[in-house]
Design a protein with these regions (language model features):
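Active-site-proximal alpha-helix that buttresses catalytic centers in soluble enzyme cores
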Residues: 1-118
């Protein structure tokens, strides 16, 4: 069974966690058979390690790490792969793979246009 770990940056503003929870509720509605957890890189106790542990406790055999980031910055180039490797060592029976950041995507451009036109 595949699990999904969505990782966001995190913020001192705690409402950002609620925003991601709302987005993940929308995702879960579209992928009802998926096992999804989220984690934050900073300013939260919802760490990558805790997210992987939660998925492992639910019996997943694979985890796809999906970054909720726009750009390929230092967290995506170094920090998240390092954390994923540490988690993989702790859970050797679980295959962990990395997804891509949101990046340059036509759908994001559409959202931006909607916001501009308001």
């Amino acid at each position: 069974m595949e699990g999904i770990l969505v990782i966001a940056h995190g913020s001192r503003a705690k409402e950002t966690e609620a925003t991601l929870d709302t987005v993940l509720s929308m995702v879960k509605a579209k992928l009802p058979d998926s096992v999804i957890e989220c984690a934050f890189m900073e300013f939260s106790d919802r760490t990558v390690e805790k997210g992987v542990s939660a998925l492992a406790a639910k019996g997943v055999t694979e985890i796809k790490v999906v970054p909720y980031f726009l750009f390929m910055g230092i967290h995506l180039k170094e920090d998240i792969p390092s954390l994923a490797a540490t988690c993989a060592a702790s859970f050797p029976d679980i295959k962990i793979t990395m997804g891509e950041p949101l990046g340059a995507d036509e759908r994001l451009a559409d959202i931006l246009v909607d916001r501009i036109k308001g």
